[in-house]
Amino acid sequence: MDFRMTEEQELLLDGLRELMERECSEDYIKQCDAEGRPPVEFYKALVDNGYGLLGCPESVGGTPVDNLTLMLVKEEICRLGGPIHALTSMFHVDMMKEFGTEEQ
């Protein structure tokens, strides 16, 4: 299996790095932690920039990507100091696709 990143993956991660730099500074995360609140502005920025439904089918407004791409995004968010719970929904995309229905 070839694990080299595609051009699309590199562009996706470049965009994510720029987003993290703008919306998820270390000071911002510390402030959220001190206030005992989740970083909702960062979550909103992820959604507004197309990362919220990454891995979901286009039919539900998502951007279909493979598991390797999802893992690269998760890894980059963590590497850059982002909140791990920002990734929670990404872990369940495969289960939703496999076991979910249109009605749900």
Go through the PLM ranges and name each one.
Residues M1-E8:
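Intrinsic disorder at enzyme termini
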Residues T6, Q31-D33, T63, E98:
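A generic secondary-structure micro-motif detector
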Residues E8-L19:
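A non-catalytic, amphipathic alpha-helix used as a structural packing/dimerization or gating element
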Residues E18, E41, M71-E75:
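Alpha-helical scaffolding segments of alpha/beta enzyme cores, especially the outer helices
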Residues E18-K30:
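N-terminal capping segment at the start of a domain
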Residues D27-N49:
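Short secondary-structure junction/hinge motifs that connect adjacent elements
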Residues D48-Q104:
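Internal helix-loop-helix
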